[in-house]
From Swiss-Prot:
<feature type="region of interest" description="Disordered">
    <location>
        <begin position="999"/>
        <end position="1066"/>
    </location>
</feature>
<keyword id="KW-0130">Cell adhesion</keyword>
<dbReference type="Pfam" id="PF00014">
    <property type="entry name" value="Kunitz_BPTI"/>
</dbReference>
<dbReference type="GO" id="GO:0030020">
    <property type="term" value="F:extracellular matrix structural constituent conferring tensile strength"/>
</dbReference>
<dbReference type="GO" id="GO:0005788">
    <property type="term" value="C:endoplasmic reticulum lumen"/>
</dbReference>
<dbReference type="GO" id="GO:0004867">
    <property type="term" value="F:serine-type endopeptidase inhibitor activity"/>
</dbReference>
<dbReference type="Pfam" id="PF00092">
    <property type="entry name" value="VWA"/>
</dbReference>
<dbReference type="InterPro" id="IPR050149">
    <property type="entry name" value="Collagen_superfamily"/>
</dbReference>
<feature type="disulfide bond">
    <location>
        <begin position="1097"/>
        <end position="1118"/>
    </location>
</feature>
<feature type="domain" description="Collagen-like 3">
    <location>
        <begin position="383"/>
        <end position="405"/>
    </location>
</feature>
<dbReference type="GO" id="GO:0005592">
    <property type="term" value="C:collagen type XI trimer"/>
</dbReference>
<feature type="region of interest" description="Disordered">
    <location>
        <begin position="242"/>
        <end position="769"/>
    </location>
</feature>
<keyword id="KW-0272">Extracellular matrix</keyword>
<keyword id="KW-0964">Secreted</keyword>
<keyword id="KW-0176">Collagen</keyword>
<keyword id="KW-0732">Signal</keyword>
<feature type="disulfide bond">
    <location>
        <begin position="1081"/>
        <end position="1105"/>
    </location>
</feature>
Length: 1125
């Protein structure tokens, strides 16, 4: 029988302890199946990782493949991470690539296994356009929030160089929001050319942490270690983190004592009846057993029941304004909102396509006309509001109207500070409520001294008994008395009646008072925040099983031994404050260190009236320094005194700070009241320009106005040409501003030969002149004046710039290219008769900025270059060259055609045009292609890009390679034009009949040996340099042409002549005396003409018709016909 009771007792104990978790009893029983399921979920840590691959144009080919290899290697390492203890990792991976668009493949929803994930990453294809990291971060954040698992660890691995497209939104706010929501970022730089500040802005790392590089051979191990630490930190917190529940019931007493001594087995009883007997009486409770040893710390308990919702906290500070997000689907129309503040002007949008011709935009603001006569009123038009006009003359103040009626409108913005008005009359005195304590005002002026003379000091008399307290006296305050000794505290007198006197000087510091009575206990504080999770305890013993069936009632056990004395119980609640004890004797007056500020005590008991102290008048001390102004006293209980005389007006106070507050809701329009009184003359500023209204119908033309000339307005944007208006009537305007200097005009035709003048008298012999210029000095002078020489200025040329505007170039380098193009244009004579220039700007699309027939002015050409927009996407070089071939179809026959390609990367593989075919077509149409390639030799794609540059260029010598764009402008101009034009060295050789000039007289420091002289270029022209030559009688500039036919040996031989030749007028053929006229047709050929001033022949371009007779087919024919002597 005892054995059955003992078993029942053990089962009851195990059932009781199973309801207890970490010293708290749960409020209700739960299924053990659910408990086991919770344990299984608590031992698994969910991990979601997103790989972001940079698929922009700057990471094509090698870098893009390297990113995919890195994802493949790191994903294997991630699945090799093993957690400690009984924890398990449940990992899912996702990947996305970004450029100007985002492609998510694979997402979390399609996760199967690691091998499938790696295959999808390897199948990624390059997008190859601009870098927009904002959209990559926003899509990754949205993917983790939508498909990531709740309470899991979320990690984003971003690979980029941090150099985004100029139109990329700011990534700071979106990355901060993602980190606040629990997403961790790890950024990896693609190369050493990286914007480290932006990567740290995204990841939130400090500047002391080094930047991770994709080229680092140990990168996979570094990130594996970082992820291992991150997972261990976040997963531990997830498992042991328990929600704070309501306080549990008080715990049970200590464990039961040991069971009593087993009794002897009694004799077997007779079998009873089959009927169940009644339950026996409950036996008396046993004596508590000995208190058991303190058990080990158990594991973290299961989360308790969720606590009650706390009181709402205060509103946090207003956060910074977020950047504009991606446009979502249109939502349902909401209620009418409040009127918001005027927004900041947005960035300029992209240029739209030209619309259909219609009513033109507003033209340039015209000059103000004379005051016109008022015309007849026209019909009411429906049009858009114009710009605010100038301020009109001030009107006469109107009469004061009746006060208006209506609801108060919204508070307007603070106006400008007006002039100080005159002092108003004294208003009715109505005592208001006591205001808040204002700031301490400035010290007032010293008052007028009181009337009276100070008496002599009397002899101190005997101390008399204190008399009764008299009524409050009236009179002027006397002079300040000497500081007496501290007397005992007297009783508090009644409240006085009278005017408050001036504030007295601060007294000496009093003795410390008696300690106050302890204050009452404060109210219970609010529930505290959840504490940090404690360290995981050691493994506990296996849990108890479920209670078994109720056993038979056992026999009453013997009385146990007396237990040991228990530990003292918890401290009881704080008692009520006791009765105040008698005052103790004053202690020593040595002040101790100040203690912590205690709780505010209750009001003390008023003390007894003290006896008057003994006062011995001492000598008058030196007046102490003026003490600080004390705080204003409390409001008195007296009656209001007699109103004093009106004081002098005080100085105006300082202007208060502008209030800060949100704009209130706009009220409903009130009932229109009668017109109010005319206000004072306002001083305001012109308001902001209103929004442009809808375009109105054109109104009828008004009568011609008669106006006076106004001030010249600022130049507005160029509008579309409008219809020709009727002839106006007005006065002539002011003289316009001096325009910019135009291009230098072509040299005029030579005039007709004048009749010979009468011979003059022989002059006196002049003094001997200085030595003439040497040949080297003449060469240097021509080089410095002519630059590339007259050849480039006069040679007919068709030149097309093909400019790379892809993402890898960048906006700064694109600006350098534009400056370079404008500088190159200055080296040629830009007009329709000589050189014509076209421009192609390309990236993933091709923009024809200017064709060959469009510009004949350098200013217009440079303006078109300045207006070119940076595209910042892919590199479609083949399509751009095909556009250049199409542009050369308008070239003049027989004129040299040159295409100059400026790029920094190889063409995109997705380009529809084939580069080899486009280059072959250019070669078949005699188009020379020069290539300027900007790429470093240590670039991984250098070899591929260099082969492509050689493929594009007509000749390997037409390829120029630079490490960066900064050296483009200074080192290329002369060198490139020595290739495009004829070699300047051969030009100087043919003039002076000698070898190359000495070093130092080359093309702006460039060695002329870099250009190979072409033997067919020949000039037969003598250059005369004398001291007495008339300045107006200069030799004409020679003209050249490229691609001239090779001359015969007889033509190539020039007969040496002296540098100084005397002009001869006796030419037999009249053609030699005609002025040079090249004609006006387009079939240009090379001819020779005779120059009488220098008695020599020179080449020129003959248009094919309508020229002068002074032209010959060869130099020999010209010399034999015209040169005499």
């Amino acid at each position: 029988m005892w054995n059955r009771y003992f078993v029942f007792y053990l089962l009851l104990l195990s059932a009781f302890t199973s309801q207890t978790v970490s010293g708290q009893r749960k409020k209700g029983p739960k299924s053990n199946l659910l408990a086991r399921k919770s344990d299984v979920q608590g031992s698994i840590c969910f991990i979601d990782i997103v790989f972001i691959v940079d698929s922009s144009e700057s990471s094509k080919i090698a870098l893009f493949d390297k990113q995919k290899d890195f994802v493949d290697s790191l994903s294997d390492k991630i699945f090799q991470l093993t957690p400690g203890r009984s924890l398990e990792y449940d990992i899912k991976l996702a990947a996305l690539q970004f450029s100007s668009s985002v492609q998510i493949d694979p997402p979390f929803s399609s996760w199967k296994d690691l091998q499938t994930f790696k295959q999808k990453v390897k199948s990624m294809n390059l997008i190859g356009q601009g870098t927009f990291s904002y959209y990559a971060i926003s899509n990754a954040t949205r993917l983790l929030k939508r498909e990531g698992r709740k309470d899991g660890v979320k990690v984003v691995l971003l690979m980029t160089d941090g150099i985004d497209h100029p139109k990329n939104p700011d990534v700071q706010s979106i990355s901060e929001d993602a980190r606040i929501s629990g997403i961790s970022f790890i950024t990896i730089a693609l190369s050493t050319v990286v914007n480290e500040a932006k990567l740290r802005l995204i990841s939130g790392d400090s500047s002391s942490e080094p930047t991770l590089l994709l080229s680092d051979p140990t990168l996979v191990d570094k990130i594996q270690d970082r992820l291992d630490i991150l997972f261990e930190k976040k997963c531990e917190r997830k498992i042991c983190e328990c929600e704070k529940g309501d306080p549990g019931d008080p715990g049970p007493p200590g464990t039961h004592g040991n069971p009593g001594i087993k009794g002897e087995r009694g004799p077997k009883g007779n079998p009873g009846n089959a009927q169940k007997g009644e339950a026996g009486e409950r036996g008396p409770g046993g004596i508590p057993g000995y208190k058991g040893d303190k058990g080990e710390r158990g594991e973290c308990g299961k989360p308790g029941i969720k606590g009650d919702k706390g009181s709402p906290g205060p509103y946090g500070p207003k956060g910074p304004r977020g950047i504009q997000g991606i446009t979502g689907p249109p939502g349902d129309p909401g209620p009418k909102g409040f009127q918001g503040n005027k927004g900041e002007p947005g960035p300029p949008g992209p240029y739209g396509s030209p619309g259909a011709p219609g009513i033109g935009q507003q033209g340039i603001k015209g000059e103000r006309g004379q005051e016109g006569r008022p015309g007849a009123p026209g019909p009411i038009g429906v049009g858009e509001p114009g710009q605010p006009g100038p301020r009109g003359p001030e009107g006469v103040p109107g009469e004061r109207g009746l006060p208006g009626e209506g609801f108060p409108g919204p508070k307007g913005e603070k106006g400008s500070e007006g002039p100080t008005g005159p002092q108003g009359l004294q208003g009715l005195s109505i005592k208001g409520e006591k205001g808040d304590i204002g700031p301490v005002g400035p010290q007032g002026p010293m008052g007028i001294p009181g009337i009276g003379s100070q008496g002599e000091q009397g002899i101190q008399g005997p101390i008399g008994p204190p008399g009764p307290q008299g009524p409050a006296g009236q009179g002027l305050p006397g002079s300040k008395g000497e500081v007496g000794q501290m007397g005992p505290t007297g009783p508090r007198g009644p409240v006085g009646i009278g005017v408050q006197g001036p504030k007295g000087e601060p007294g000496s510091i009093g003795l410390p008072g008696q300690p106050g009575v302890p204050g009452e206990d404060g109210a219970a504080g609010k529930k505290g925040e959840a504490g940090l999770p404690g360290a995981r305890g050691p493994e506990g013993p296996p849990g108890k099983g479920q209670p078994g069936p109720k056993g038979d009632e056992g026999k009453k056990g013997s009385k146990g031994n007396q237990g040991q004395r228990g530990l003292p119980g918890p401290e009881g609640p704080k008692g009520e404050p006791g009765i105040m004890g008698p005052f103790g004797m004053p202690g020593t007056s040595i002040p101790g260190p100040p203690g912590p500020k205690g709780d505010r005590g209750g009001p003390g008991i008023p003390g007894f009236k003290g006896e008057p102290g003994l006062s011995i008048r001492g000598p008058k001390g030196v007046q102490g320094p003026r003490g600080p102004v004390g705080a204003p006293g409390l409001k008195g209980d007296g009656y209001p005194g007699v109103p004093g005389p009106r004081g002098l007006p005080g100085p105006p106070g300082p202007m208060g700070l502008r209030g800060v507050g949100d704009t209130g809701a706009k009220g409903e329009p009130g009932v229109r009241g009668p017109p109010g009184p005319s206000g004072p003359r306002g001083v305001g500023t012109q308001g902001p320009k209103g929004d442009t209204g809808q375009k109105g119908l054109p109104g009828p033309p008004g009568p011609p106005g008669y106006g006076s000339q106004g001030i010249k307005g600022e130049q507005g944007p160029q509008g579309f040409p409008g219809p020709k208006g009727t002839m106006g009537h007005g006065l002539p305007g002011q003289k316009g501003e001096h325009g910019e200097r135009g291009d230098v005009g072509k040299k005029g035709d030579k005039g007709e030969i004048g009749e010979p003048g009468s011979p003059g008298k022989q002059g006196l012999q002049g003094p001997k002149g200085d030595l003439g210029l040497t040949k080297e000095e003449i060469i240097k002078l021509i080089t410095e004046i002519c630059g590339c020489g007259p050849k480039c200025k006069e040679t007919p040329l068709e030149l097309v710039f093909v400019i790379d505007s892809s993402e890898s170039v960048g906006p700064e380098n694109f600006q350098i290219i534009k400056n370079f193009v404008k500088t190159m244009a200055d080296r040629v004579a830009l007009d329709l008769a000589t050189a014509r220039i076209g421009i192609i700007n390309y990236s993933h699309k091709v923009e024809k900025v200017a064709n060959l027939k469009q510009f004949s002015s350098k200013d217009d050409f440079k303006l078109a270059v300045d207006n070119m927009q940076y595209l910042g996407e892919g590199t479609y070089t083949a399509t751009a060259l095909q556009a250049a071939n199409d542009m050369f179809e308008d070239a003049r026959p027989g004129v040299k055609k040159v295409a100059l390609v400026i790029t920094d990367g190889q063409t995109d593989s997705r380009d529809k045009e084939k580069l080899t075919e486009v280059v072959k077509n250019a070669s078949d149409t005699n188009v020379e292609i020069f290539v300027i390639g900007v790429v470093k030799k240590n670039d991984p794609n250098f070899e591929i890009f260099h082969k492509e540059m050689n493929l594009i260029a007509t000749d390997p010598e037409h390829v120029y390679q630079f490490d960066d764009f900064f050296t483009l402008q200074d080192t290329l101009k002369q060198k490139l034009f020595q290739k495009i034009c004829e070699d300047f060295d051969s030009y100087l050789v043919q003039i002076f009949g000698s070898s190359s000039p000495q070093p130092g007289f080359g093309m702006s420091g460039e060695e002329l040996s870099e250009s190979t002289p072409e033997p067919q270029k020949e000039i037969s022209e003598s250059l005369s340099v004398t001291r007495d030559q008339d300045e107006d009688d200069k030799a004409p500039e020679p003209t050249w042409a490229d691609d001239l036919p090779a001359t015969t040996s007889s033509e190539a031989t020039t007969t040496p002549r002296p540098l100084l030749s005397t002009p001869v007028d006796g030419a037999e053929d009249p053609r030699c005396l005609e002025a040079l006229k090249p004609g006006n047709c387009g079939e240009y050929v090379v001819r020779w003409y005779y120059d009488k001033q220098v008695n020599s022949c020179a080449r020129f371009w003959f248009s094919g018709c309508n020229g002068s007779g002074n032209r010959f087919n060869s130099e020999k024919e010209c010399q034999e016909t015209c040169i005499q002597g």
